[in-house]
Amino acid sequence: MTLGSGGSSVVVPRNFRLLEELERGEKGIGDGTVSYGMDDGDDIYMRSWTGTIIGPHNTVHEGRIYQLKLFCDKDYPEKPPTVRFHSRVNMACVNHETGVVDPKKFGLLANWQREYTMEDILVQLKKEMSTSHNRKLVQPPEGTCF
């Protein structure tokens, strides 16, 4: 959402918002340890995305590359995307059988706001890997998938 003339708010349409996110994802983000892009360039609804997180330093995740799937339904960005790890990971907010990030256990999804982005989700998941309850959890063998 942005402010229009006279302080009125303007709601950016879903597809424009996703195009902005696609452009930002293609340019690269921050320090390069998180990235994302569309799965299928022909999907006019821009629903299916792939994210990548490189595990943070000084944790059991260090140097590991995690692949995720993000699915933006028609209600995005009013409602958060569904987020699922493709790479196996052991984290408190991730279902150990399906790889789905549980919105009830992951604050950003639980308290979703329209202004949040897929980049925010990936950055926050990386931060979550560094928290005291996740940083030392025994991890599945590298390269295994859900």
Curated annotation (Swiss-Prot):
It comes from the Eukaryota. Gene3D superfamilies: Ubiquitin Conjugating Enzyme (3.10.110.10). Residues 13-146 form the UBC core domain. The lineage of its organism: Eukaryota, Viridiplantae, Streptophyta, Embryophyta, Tracheophyta. Heterodimer with UBC35 or UBC36. Pfam families: UQ_con. Disulfide bonds: none annotated. This is Ubiquitin-conjugating enzyme E2 variant 1D. InterPro entries: UBQ-conjugat_E2_core (IPR000608), UBQ-conjugating_enzyme/RWD (IPR016135). Induction: Not induced by stresses. Disruption phenotype: Plants do not display apparent morphological variations, but are sensitive to the DNA-damaging agent MMS. SMART domains: UBCc. PANTHER family: UBIQUITIN-CONJUGATING ENZYME E2. Belongs to the ubiquitin-conjugating enzyme family. Has no ubiquitin ligase activity on its own. The heterodimer with UBC catalyzes the synthesis of non-canonical poly-ubiquitin chains that are linked through 'Lys-63'. This type of poly-ubiquitination does not lead to protein degradation by the proteasome. Mediates transcriptional activation of target genes. May play a role in the control of progress through the cell cycle and differentiation. Involved in the error-free DNA repair pathway and contributes to the survival of cells after DNA damage. Expressed in roots, shoots, leaves, stems, flowers and pollen.
